[in-house]
C-alpha cells in the first residue's frame, strides 16, 4: 500500500518513498545531481554525434552525417601517403637483383622490414612466426639449406616453390621408397650408419654393413660423405639437423615411405618485388650465404 505521510527510517535516518510491501519500506536515495546532469549530457552528445557523423544504417549505406566524415576514406588517404613515401624504394627493389638490394644498406633495411611483414602473413603458418620451422618444415634460421642459401637461390625457391605441380621451374626431387628394395635388416643397418655420423649408434656393430648399403643405394644423391647435394635437394645427413624426425626409427620410416614436402610458388601470388623482399628477409635471419 502507499503511505501518504513522509516516513523516516529509524536505522538509516533516510526518508522513505512512501511505498511499503509486506512491511518493507523503500529508502528514498535519489541519484546525485552531477550524475543526472552527466547522463543528460551523454544523451545530448549522442544525438549530436548521430547528426554529425555516419551512424544510422540504411538499406545500402549508413547516413553520412553533416560533417561528411569517413574513416574508410581517411585510411585510403593514409595508405596512399604511405605508398607514395615507399615508391622510391619499391621502384629500386623492382629494378635491382636480390644481391644488389642486400649490398645497398638503405634498400636492404627496407626489404628486411617489408619481408618480415609478408613472412608473417604468408609463411609463418608453416615455418613458424620465428622461422624456426617444425617437423616437415625447414628451419630458416640455421645454415642447413636443401636448395642453397645464397640470395638468388633463396629467391628461386620462394618464387617457384618446391614440387609445385603447375610451375615449370619449381624445385623438384624425389626419394624412392626403399621398402621394396632393401630388406628390413639392410634398412636397420643403414639407419645405424646414418645415426653414427652425428652420434653414437644404438647398434654399433651394424655401422660398417650400413655404410656399404648406403654407398650402394644412397650415396648417388646424398654424397659419399652423406653431406647432401643441393642441386638435387638431397639433405645433409651428417649435421644432426632432421626434417622429418630424429632417431633410427625415423630414418627407417623415411626410407620405407619417404615424405615429400610441397611449398607453393609465390611469384604468381605476390609478384617479383615482394618475393625479393622475402628473399632478403630470409637471407638476413642468420643462415644466409
Swiss-Prot record:
Q: State which residue ranges cross the membrane.
A: 34-56
What biological processes does GO assign it?
Answer: oxidative phosphorylation; proton transmembrane transport
Domain of life (superkingdom) = Bacteria
Q: Where is the Cytochrome c domain?
A: 110-198, 205-286
**Residues in compartment: Periplasmic:** 57-289
Pathway, per UniProt?
Answer: Energy metabolism; oxidative phosphorylation
Q: What is its cofactor? A: heme c
Any GO molecular function: heme binding
* Gene Ontology CC: one annotated term: plasma membrane
Q: Which UniProt keywords apply?
A: Cell inner membrane, Cell membrane, Electron transport, Heme, Hydrogen ion transport, Ion transport, Iron, Membrane, Metal-binding, Oxidoreductase, Plasmid, Repeat, Respiratory chain, Transmembrane, Transmembrane helix, Transport
What are the binding positions for heme c 1 in this chain? 123, 126-127, 263
Which InterPro entries does this entry report, sorted A to Z? CcoP_N (IPR032858), CcoP_N_sf (IPR038414), Cyt_c-like_dom (IPR009056), Cyt_c-like_dom_sf (IPR036909), Cyt_C_IC (IPR008168), Cyt_c_oxidase_cbb3_su3 (IPR004678), Cytochrome_c_Oxidase_Subunit (IPR050597)
Membrane topology, Cytoplasmic segments: 1-33
Q: Where in the cell is it found?
A: Cell inner membrane
Cofactor descriptive note: Binds 2 heme C groups per subunit.
Which residues bind heme c 2 per the record? 175, 218, 221-222
Q: How does it sit in the membrane?
A: Single-pass membrane protein
SUBUNIT field: Component of the cbb3-type cytochrome c oxidase at least composed of FixN, FixO, FixQ and FixP.
What the protein does?
C-type cytochrome. Part of the cbb3-type cytochrome c oxidase complex. FixP subunit is required for transferring electrons from donor cytochrome c via its heme groups to FixO subunit. From there, electrons are shuttled to the catalytic binuclear center of FixN subunit where oxygen reduction takes place. The complex also functions as a proton pump.
| The family this protein is said to belong to | Belongs to the CcoP / FixP family.
PANTHER family reported for this sequence? CBB3-TYPE CYTOCHROME C OXIDASE SUBUNIT FIXP
Name the chain's protein: Cbb3-type cytochrome c oxidase subunit FixP
- Organism name: Sinorhizobium medicae (strain WSM419) (Ensifer medicae)
Q: Kindly list the organism's lineage.
A: Bacteria, Pseudomonadati, Pseudomonadota, Alphaproteobacteria, Hyphomicrobiales
